[in-house]
Amino acid sequence: MSVNRYTITNLSDYSNPKVVKKLLYSLDKLYHAAMWKGDGDSLAIYVDLKSAMHAKGVLTEKQMVYLKMWLDGYTQAEIGAKYKVGRDNISYRIDNAVKNMSLFLGN
């Protein structure tokens, strides 16, 4: 996903978990746009997402670990193999992490 002002404006509905997941997947691009291009909107979204990830009570420890690995580029199957759980379990926990973040940010 290309990060530009149009994309940011249309993807700033935090109450929608699908939007939050797309933004999380673009976290590095948001950081790059904020730091190297001076995009204040990207910076605000980056800070919001990072704050939600680290806010007490938003994510469980497993959700945090799996989400970070997914954001680092590991597939759900690779994460599952590392922790000896099924890919469906990883998918479930990542999706719930995104929903929790969406609820936190959407309020």
Regions found by a protein language model. Give the residues of each.
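Amphipathic alpha-helical segment used for protein-protein interaction
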Residues: 33-61
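Charged, low-cysteine interdomain linkers and short loop/connector segments
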Residues: 1-43
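Short amphipathic alpha helix immediately N-terminal
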Residues: 56-74
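DNA-recognition helix of helix-turn-helix
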Residues: 83-106
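Hydrophobic positions on the alpha-helical face of helix-turn-helix-like DNA-binding modules
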Residues: 66, 78-81, 90
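Intrinsically disordered, low-complexity basic tails/linkers immediately adjacent to helix-turn-helix/homeobox/MYB/SANT
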Residues: 14-17, 21, 99-107
